[in-house]
Amino acid sequence: MSITITTWNVNSLKVRQPQVLDFLKETENSILCLQELKMQEADIDAAAFKKVGYTLDAFGQKTYNGVATILRDPLTFLPDEEVRNIPGFEDPQSRLLATTVQVGSEKLRVINGYFPNGETVESEKFPYKLAWLEALVQWLPSQLEEYPNLVLLGDFNIAPEDRDVWDPES
């Protein structure tokens, strides 16, 4: 079975839900991973996704962050295998959702992340970003061992060149 996977930083699902639903209808994407939902799970209209043939699993947070993985029917989540945030890393922010998807007779591990933006090296946010990335690096080998079919995707918030950002002067 062939699948298509797309990742999209929506910068507010509340604002972009119509465009996301249009995208799903037009592309018949197998798996869509969203970042920067900026809303809690309870506020997401999961029925709207179901209506167009998709199942949604989200890990949200009011106003900031949040990730969601959306599957086209007949793909299904294995809910007992879901992980929210990096195990062993205390984090009040909703930044990572690891789900397992049944694809025919195979399992696919989808790790959807909204990686921290460390801003500049001098920023007080930079040590948090480095600690988060280190925790991810420490956790990933166990995931690869358990799930040989694994995809890590999302908004990595890494911009090595000016052309990688919207406004390099800011």
Where are each of the predicted segments found?
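Active-site neighborhood of phospho(di)ester-bond hydrolases with catalytic His/Asp-centered motifs
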Residues: L32-Q35, A58, L152-G154
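Short glycine-enriched, charge-decorated loop/helix-capping segments at active-site entrances
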Residues: S123-P127, D167-S170
